[in-house]
């Protein structure tokens, strides 16, 4: 089994803003090269960063793995996170759909890159 990439979404279900990469310089350059495809949708964060706490341990088993993190808008994160407001009924359906579309598009591009 060979793991080459992983993605995590664990920063809330808010409007998408981009993706971060914990990987090689080549992985980071690839990520940055994808930014133009997302510009029209107001995604602008394509930078070196943290993949996520849940996928982080994969680096021990697969040192070359590229870890990507989905970055949503963070303005209201602590209005919800671990508060009484942190229930599914309070999730903005449109923002969740936009995030799902961004991640699906990103995964398609990732698949094309690592074929």
Predicted regions and their residues:
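His/Asp/Glu-rich mid-to-C-terminal helical/loop segments that flank catalytic regions of hydrolases
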Residues: 77-115
């Amino acid at each position: 089994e060979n793991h080459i990439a992983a993605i995590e979404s664990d920063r809330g279900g808010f409007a998408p803003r981009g993706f971060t990469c914990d990987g090689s310089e080549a992985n980071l350059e690839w990520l940055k090269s994808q930014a133009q495809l997302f510009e029209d949708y107001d995604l602008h964060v394509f930078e070196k960063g943290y993949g996520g706490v849940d996928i982080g341990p994969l680096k021990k088993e697969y040192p070359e793995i590229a870890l990507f993190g989905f970055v949503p808008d963070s303005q209201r994160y602590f209005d919800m996170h671990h508060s009484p407001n942190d229930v599914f009924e309070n999730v903005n359906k449109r923002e969740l759909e936009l995030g799902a579309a961004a991640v699906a598009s990103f995964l398609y591009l990732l698949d094309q890159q690592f074929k």
